[in-house]
Amino acid sequence: MAASAVTARYGTLHNTSMAVVSLGMIVVAIVHFLSNPANAPTLSLNDPRFALFLMLAMAMLYYVFQGVTRTLNREPQVVIDHDGIRLGFGRNKSFTWDDIVWVRLRRLALRPQLEIGLADQAFITANLRLSMWSFDDSLRPVRGQPTTLLVRDNGLDTKSSAMLDAVRSFRPNLVK
């Protein structure tokens, strides 16, 4: 029996909830200041409270945007099949099984994350534009392992353990 491909898309519930909660936080702050005008900051950048709430509102609007765009994006972000692993997340890079040296689960806080060790040349050629400072990116570098990337399943509809099981079904020799 041939193994079937596993795909992971952005989860609708998670990302819609993120957008709704972020928008709700902005609305609650506005309603609070409208009902308590004595506590409201003055509409001037010279008032540090206004500057703080403006920055917080911009951050929350960013998460509203992220939640809505991810909810509407139904493209697979991770595909594991007989050809290898394809990663989306705005990069759309494919790695054949020959490019992948090993795969394992790594615990990051409480959640397991899929860690993929790539061959040096495959990692360099892919130019994944990874950043340690991007908190929203589902692809992260692993400190101390230059050709390894971490696939975070936060906001995806498939858990990392299911992705590891898919790798195991196609190439059991790669699982650490």
What are these regions (language model features)?
Residues 61-104:
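Conserved beta-hairpin
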Residues 105-109:
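Short, conserved beta-turn/loop elements at beta-strand boundaries and strand-helix junctions
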Residues 111-176:
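A membrane-cytosol interface segment of integral membrane proteins
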